[in-house]
């Protein structure tokens, strides 16, 4: 079950961050600028910022199995819609406008109730004493499946035409992304235990109360950690531009640059995450 949850977490975030591996295909197929590609992620970030808190509140009242299935199904539909946008070869402004809407809506799939539902599902699988082990297995499965999915996406890009037929290759790469979120939806429907809403209800002391917001905002540690995360994520986001550097300056192919991106983003994380936990 934890491996399936890892597949869900590893697959749903591939699409909104696809430019980390497929930077040049995204730019060239949509006929957009570097700034416009950045705005896609900005739309996604805005949606996530707005939705995380209400999503967490709603997750307290929602069965995690239903929430995960709905989130993954919506992600599959939106990823498929983007693939169709590529296939239709729409005018640049139209295709880009549709893409902005898709990136905003994908926040509903991955940033609304999904993340909290994943945490809730992991929590109910094991006992209180097993939580550390449960999360460790989940994150290992998450990183491993994300690396495998990204590699399959890159294979689909090459099989579909690669740099010689970038539109076709990019289309099949996006289709493969949708296939994995669909697979995760089916596996969760089959294997994740669907406990009753009564069994999954959150204890009163653990539920969200608006008065807690004031308490949290008064805590200096919260602001300090927020600044740290902001800085770290800023560096992480900027690392996406290492991919076009490899293709434009170093003159690597999209495939070779994609392999470097997968190594940087997923494989290194598999080593760095547990090492960081030890340190």
Could you say what each language-model-derived stretch is?
Residues 102-141:
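Cytoplasmic helix-loop-helix junction between adjacent transmembrane helices
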